[in-house]
């Protein structure tokens, strides 16, 4: 029956093309019509940007590069950002009232918000904490990166600065719980205080190598560490003690640390992850999706590290690569996979079973629904999408879920609210 229907569609489409040519319609019209016909029957989630979310922060606070995002079991949205952290791009001098640490204020605007920010579902800022504290029993990352709240309410933070070879664990209100790994463990024999140097060690069972992000597997009480900006592995840890239980590199092989050089489109697939290994997300069915960002690919494994398959995404993307972060739709089967692409500036929507890209939204720019360095992506219990932006983007955005509907364009552009059009 499906073949008969498909055959009829082909005949109808051919007739439309012939009719269009007879009336002298343009080739571009024909191409657009062909795309619509090809996508007939394809369904995907629909989203609209919420330009009024989140609400303004107090105290003239602003965000720096916003490089971590999670949604907890209360649908509170957590981000971590770099305000004026030493050694990072942070905020530009024109964004800060105090240009020189300890110096005078040059005006009212602005001050860096604390690194960890918690928003409720309505967009109100309800929590803020974090940063370096003199005499603290932990070492705040040189360059914090990634945040997640686990099933017990603990907050986990990584870091991708030079000295960041550890993970931190706090309570929801910022009380220190544990540090796993030692800061500075990746310093090599040539390193000096004046000129530090570092070397990866993806076989280290006690420390990490610039962690990008952690995924929480609540049922197994495990964390999947994307390790990351210096090491080349996924490391699975026990959430109670931070011990590494297992790890793997690309294709499920033991991780190695050779320098692969720059990614070159058209070359055979790299046999190891490039830096950074930017995410390791676990679906409900146990499939582990690893963001091999500069290799423009997702590698998929089972929980033991057995390689299943890989999917390449926009393989002509250079520099920082196309595969930045991954989240899943909120139906039980997690039918759809969402991907942040911070070079091409899209949120891509895939059918998860086939890993076919159905459509994408967003493009480069500063207005609501646009992106500059879209870095992290997460979903809440209602299926809404949240994104954060690094580099000069420096913000958090919300995209309201509007149900499932037909795909009318592969590239949607800005998903502007229907009520505002």
Please provide the spans of the model-predicted regions.
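Juxtamembrane low-complexity tails/linkers enriched in Ser/Thr-Pro and polybasic
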Residues: 1-4
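Eukaryotic scaffold repeat domains enriched in small/polar residues
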Residues: 7-18, 22-421
